[in-house]
């Protein structure tokens, strides 16, 4: 099987997920607004936004990178950032106690879903690349 055409596919998927995360946190998955005062939900949103931008940059570089070792490193980086994104709201940074507010009802599940998808895509690509690396006699 010729993998030359499939190589940028994972990078494009990772980039699309990263863009979805950044746009989502800025639009429909916003944190709650308690009297306009920055609270822990706003800080969690900012942390997710920053991690989403890092994921976007790694994903774009992953599309154009030709070195196999660097691609594996970029996949690992995106997978780890995806795990971080999934854990930021509610696990690493506490959110509001009210489960009906947007931070708990929308932002947290959205970030968990996209973060897990980023981790799965990056980790899956890394695993496939490591399996191909372990089989030196087969076509890469």
Where are these regions (language model features)?
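Cytosolic juxtamembrane helix and N-cap/initiation of the first transmembrane helix
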Residues: 1-20, 128, 140
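Alpha-helical membrane-associated segments of multi-pass integral membrane proteins
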Residues: 11, 99-130
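C-terminal TM-helix exit segments that contain a strictly Trp-centered aromatic cap at the helix terminus
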Residues: 18-29, 80-96
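Interfacial non-cytosolic loop connecting adjacent transmembrane helices
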Residues: 30-45, 88-113
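Hydrophobic alpha-helical transmembrane segments
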Residues: 49-59
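Loop-to-transmembrane helix junctions at the membrane interface
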Residues: 61-83
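Short, Lys/Arg-enriched, Gly/Pro-containing loop segments at transmembrane-helix junctions
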Residues: 133-140
């Amino acid at each position: 099987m010729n993998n030359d055409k499939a190589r940028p596919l994972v990078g494009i998927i990772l980039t699309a997920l990263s863009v979805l995360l950044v746009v989502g946190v800025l639009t429909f998955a916003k944190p709650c607004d308690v009297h306009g005062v920055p609270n822990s939900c706003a800080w969690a949103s900012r942390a997710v936004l920053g991690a989403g931008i890092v994921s976007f940059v790694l994903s774009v570089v992953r599309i154009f990178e030709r070195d196999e070792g660097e691609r594996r490193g970029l996949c690992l980086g995106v997978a780890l950032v995806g795990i971080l994104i999934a854990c930021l709201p509610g696990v690493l940074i506490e959110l509001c106690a009210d489960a009906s507010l947007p931070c708990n009802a929308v932002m947290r599940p959205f970030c968990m879903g996209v973060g897990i998808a980023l981790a799965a895509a990056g980790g899956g690509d890394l695993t496939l690349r490591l399996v191909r690396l372990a089989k030196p006699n087969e076509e890469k």
